């Protein structure tokens, strides 16, 4: 059984987790088992799509790989960030020489910001109930 050459990267953002497989090809996109013309058909927002494929753009590898992505959790914004990190990490497996370019654009950094939990006695994480002196 011949194994298909591919590159793998995991990305996380907020509560979203993306597992990204890059395979040499002509730019086909498959997200959660469903074929798409482009990532824009999945994200439905050009800003999220641009954010997700940014690693391919800055390394001039757009159209060189077929993307197979499994993403779950979070919303579309968090998923786009997770896909972005996953693609960047997979590109590093493909070519270690891309590291300075990806690092320059801060694509190898996991965004640590998470939603702060709500505390009892408060309306939200930090918003206290209105205070009245009299």
From Swiss-Prot:
PROSITE patterns recorded:
RIBOSOMAL_S9 (PS00360)
> Which residue ranges are recorded for the region named Disordered?
114-134
Could you state one GO biological process linked to this protein? Answer: translation
Q: Which keywords does this chain's UniProt record carry?
A: Ribonucleoprotein, Ribosomal protein
Please list the GO terms describing molecular function: RNA binding; structural constituent of ribosome
- Entry's InterPro entries? Ribosomal_Su5_D2-typ_SF, Ribosomal_uS9, Ribosomal_uS9_bac/plastid, Ribosomal_uS9_CS, Ribsml_uS5_D2-typ_fold_subgr
Q: Which Gene3D superfamilies does the entry link to?
A: 3.30.230.10
Q: Which GO terms describe its cellular component?
A: cytosolic small ribosomal subunit
Q: Which segments show compositional bias classed as Basic residues?
A: 120-134
**Top-level taxon of the source organism:** Bacteria
Identify the NCBIfam families for this entry. Answer: PRK00132.1 (NF001099)
The family assignment reads: Belongs to the universal ribosomal protein uS9 family.
Q: Could you identify this protein by its name? A: Small ribosomal subunit protein uS9
